Amino acid sequence: FEEQIMMEADRLRNPSYYPEGSDYLAEYIRNHKLAEYLELIKESKKICTIPVIASINCYTDAEWVDFAKQIEEAGADALEINILALQSDIQYKYGSFEQRHIDILSHIKKTIRIPVIMKLGSNFTNPVALIDQLYANGAAAVVLFNRFYQPDIDVEKMEHTSGDVFSNASDLSTTLRWIGISSSLVSKIDYAASGGIHKPDGI
């Protein structure tokens, strides 16, 4: 997760340090976390007989294009891009979040040759139009849908707490509905369902 890596690096920044030292520490944390993930891919390839699909959760296209290349070199058979971000800016420009998906995909496709899969959220006004544009820009497949972290409040302690971590079976109907709609209109791209699959019947 891009935000987790960046948050940990920022957390270790100390204003009392020299700026160069603080930047070095942040860069070390980032590189260490990414190296751990690349090693996981390499080890998985040694023991798995099925394709290994790597996944990165990001919301910018700055450094993740380079990381995608490293993932390919580590042996991943495909790469899933999960662009998960809560849009709450009052100055938000309509359509800019959809365009960010297309821009990140386009940049990554120029760097790697393995298939790129885009995982989408369920809060788009018109997922079909976005899927069509993703296919036009080289996406091999889409996954519907990703899921926001669900915060909650403990009313007894009046503290923030985590909400339900897992999906529930009722989530599947929305996913299947949109896969049905989208696949009938944009049929040349592959689809995968995510969330709400709790028993064999869902598969």
Show which residues each predicted segment covers:
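Alpha/beta enzyme core
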Residues: 4-16, 32-42, 46-53, 57-194, ...
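Short glycine/proline- and acidic residue-enriched helix-loop micro-motifs
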Residues: 19-28
